[in-house]
Amino acid sequence: MTSSTAKSGVGGRPIETYERKTAEVHSWDPATVDVAQRISDLIKERRPDLVVEHIGSTAVPGLPGKGIVDLSIETEPAEIPGIVEMLYELGFQPQPGPDPWPPTRPMPVGSIEHDGTEYRIHLHVQPKGGDFPRDIAFREALRNDPELTRQYTDLKLGITQGGAVDGFRYTHSKTTWILGVYRKLGFVPPAILPPATIGILGGGQLGRMLALAAREMGYRIAVLDPDEHCPAASVADRVVVGTYDDLEAARRLADGCAVVTYELEHVSAPLVSAIDDGVVAMRPGPYPLKMTQDRLAERKFLESNGVPVAPWRPVSSAAELRAAAAQLGYPVRLKANIGGYDGRSQRRLANPEEVKAHIAAQPIDTRMLLEREMQFRSELSVVVARATDGICVSFPPARNRHDDGILVESVVPAGIAPEVEEAARELAERLATGMGLIGVLTVELFLMRDGSLVVNELAPRVHNSGHWTIEGAATSQFEQHVRAICGLPLGSVELRSPAAAMVNLLGGGDRRPTTIEGLREALAVQDTHLHLYDKRDVFERRKMGHVTALGATTDEALARAREAASHLRWGGPSGDADADG
């Protein structure tokens, strides 16, 4: 709520425009009860049959909160479009931001002036059979249980610490506590149990290993991929051939699925939003995907959550590139804002002459990200899972080595101080909570020479640097992702042996049909495990598989994995090439 001079709504309508703001906790304002009644009266003038309930924190006397007036209407699903249209006529607007409620359960927003103060309004339009009874029960529990109200107050004040925080972080940081109250009230969301079908957007090696883990748990699998012979095809029950922006193909995939997930970030965000319709569970949802597809949005998200990143600037012209490089200091890395993985779509620029040469060869005509190259001690990654109840479980950090942007090796333990490991895992769990993710998130980090951590990038999915978990941890990242998206308890992340290592198997040479040599020698190496991705063709630096090894130390595990990988060669007319590139 903010003080306001008198004004009228857009076009003379009673409801005024809405502005998203950071979250601040204020004392309860009794005027919010009058505001709620005013909104209810406005709606009943148009639709006397509707019951408008005041919910949320402002509906509980004495409970601090953001001051937003939350209201809820329960109706038949077929009535929702007409009710939303009526609300728009009053001046309400569609919910802004990157993570709106689906059209099957919309939340129009607006504001209204009351006694010289502007109040923001969230109006939830809920289908019968949805969460309306739960929200009312939660309100009544808070109204009638002073201890519950005290706990909720302490939680809110603990999140904001007397200041303003990102709205998503504020909302999702309350999830675990709120869902615990729901359970006590008897509202427990049902888990998705076998033999339900899990849909996977993307049929590459990550989709394949997800499918294998899910099938071991008894689930059926449907996959969407442009290639009918993709790696996941041979382990899926159903393959839908289509591109990652083919909405019709995605709907065919979702038909018959209980939950849909994605194995890569190159899926169309509008496509994911369309699937996330409140009928089929889309996990993770559209917001983590949108945010990580856009590097500038990702940087802003990280900074809004108090996470350190490399100094950066947005650039969209040659002049901006020159100025930003001079401000940041060389060397810098110029990255495409959209797209790119495994080091693609980025360029290292070491001095002004290289900037000049790059501009001459490739004019800057779109938004890009320029960041200072970090002088780090090592590269780390943390894979964290967040369940439907908001509980987060993170795997031990892995220490990674890249070659020209492509991951080559990962080892666990990472050989870092206990306090650094604790900080890395806490940071990953905070980010998963801040984006409201359900599933697995991978956080790539730089460990700086002073022991501090800097986030490089995020991936809202299972990740190459987590492959060691298949044999190295009690629960693999793939099984953990399935558990999370299906509403099951998360598994243990304890190591199965003192150390684990993973070495990627990269292709070499020209494109040709896949044949592999040296399997007998590779499999003879003690305590090693070979994973091949069933890719029909091999070519230079293509990820064809990986080797995991266990050992008493990271040196022993890595030596075993390297030895096994060294025996593997890709045959074919263009000549042999080492499997590890």
For each predicted feature, which ranges?
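Helical scaffold of the NTase/Pol beta-like nucleotidyltransferase catalytic core
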Residues: 2-53
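ATP-binding N-terminal substructure of ATP-dependent carboxylate-amine bond-forming enzymes
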Residues: 190-297, 319
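Active-site "cap" helix and flanking loop/linker of ATP-utilizing ligase/carboxylase catalytic domains
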Residues: 422-443, 449, 459-511
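Active-site nucleotide-donor binding segment shared across nucleotidyl transfer reactions
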Residues: 40-82
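Conserved catalytic core of two-metal-ion nucleotidyltransferases
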Residues: 92-130
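Catalytic cores of NTP-dependent nucleotidyl/adenyl transfer enzymes across multiple folds
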Residues: 129-190
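Active-site nucleotide/adenylate-binding loops and adjacent lid/helix of ATP-dependent enzymes
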Residues: 291-381, 385-404, 408-434
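Peripheral (often C-terminal) accessory segments that flank ATP-dependent C-N-forming ligase machineries
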Residues: 194, 483-581
